[in-house]
Amino acid sequence: MNGSWITILSLLVISQLASSKVTLIGKNTFLSFDDVEANFTPVVRRSGEYGLLYAAEPLDACSYLTNMAEKGSKFRPSYVLIVRGGCSFEEKIRNAQEAGYKAAIVYNDRYEELLVRMAGNSSGVYIHGVLVTRTSGEVLKEYTSRAEMELLLIPGFGISSWSIMAITFVSLLVISAVLASYFSVRRHRIRQHVRDLHHGGQGHSRMPKDLLQSMPTEVYTGVLEEGSTSVTCAICIDDYRVGEILRILPCKHKYHAVCIDSWLGRCRSFCPVCKQNPRTGNDVPPASETTPLISPGPNSITSLQSFYDLPIVVRVYL
């Protein structure tokens, strides 16, 4: 639901950015109207174009205009208001240009007509041309030939319907990806929580550092104790070297201190070999997807490891 509202809001913002504006500015007056630029006239500058507005004579500008543009300062160019119909858009624009106007604002002659991009031959056309609705044109006509009123042409960003569709499609993809990631992470956390509950909160709880450091250690001398055949760390699968520090768990299994510290401090609090909890001395936890069904015996040469935690290793002495 939230994604739908985001998409709708994006479309509204894009539609506002894509439309250009015709704006009347005067003392205590500020009126703005949507317009569409012609496709054969120069594009309105980003900074906008402004000037004084006059009504064409004749109003349809299908013949040479009898009211020529006033020769004022170059900073106050003259714009002309023209009604649609009677001849082509191109003919209206060219007649306005011949009369010395710098821009032509054409308005629809019917209320129900939509704004379209006026078409024509761009050769020799150097003035701006825009189309507004009939309602906008009638309001603009009331403010023609008034020196205190200034007309400002504000360009749009020229976003086409295809661009809007592309942006909408990309937005939907991004929203879908975010939602998919959210539900994927949520599902993973739920599964992890269920797995922790299944193990009674012990098999995957992190061991406190102070308890870990309290377990005894010894320096490996290369001399095996009576009855001991372990010369390899079951975690990193490397042989012990003389001088290395080994940590001894309550179950009497030994490992590299670095390896077992990382193992027990990383959300695992059981012996990698016998699966006993070093804190409580509990027996092997119930079989699950993270613990094997059969624990290795003391005389076994095969060390079965957890499916997620350690690989299966077979060590053969020749």
UniProtKB/Swiss-Prot annotation:
Gene3D superfamilies (alphabetical): 3.50.30.30, Zinc/RING finger domain, C3HC4 (zinc finger)
Signal sequence interval, chain numbering: 1-20
Major location category of this protein: membrane
Example GO BP: protein transport
Any single Pfam family the record assigns to this protein: zf-RING_2
Zinc finger (RING-type): 233-275
Membrane topology: Single-pass type I membrane protein
Transmembrane segments: 163-183
GO terms of molecular function: zinc ion binding
Keywords: Disulfide bond, Glycoprotein, Membrane, Metal-binding, Protein transport, Signal, Transmembrane, Transmembrane helix, Transport, Vacuole, Zinc, Zinc-finger
GO cellular component: endomembrane system; protein storage vacuole membrane
Cytoplasmic side: 184-318
Localization, UniProt: Prevacuolar compartment membrane; Protein storage vacuole membrane
Lumenal-facing ranges: 22-162
InterPro entries linked: E3_ligase_sorting_rcpt, PA_dom_sf, PA_domain, RNF11_RING-H2, Znf_RING, Znf_RING/FYVE/PHD, ZNRF4/RNF13/RNF167_PA
Glycosylation sites: N121
Disulfide pattern: C62-C87
Keyword Transcription attributed: no
Annotated ranges, domain PA: 70-143
Function: Involved in the trafficking of vacuolar proteins. May function as a sorting receptor for protein trafficking to the protein storage vacuole (PSV).
Listed name of the protein: Receptor homology region, transmembrane domain- and RING domain-containing protein 6
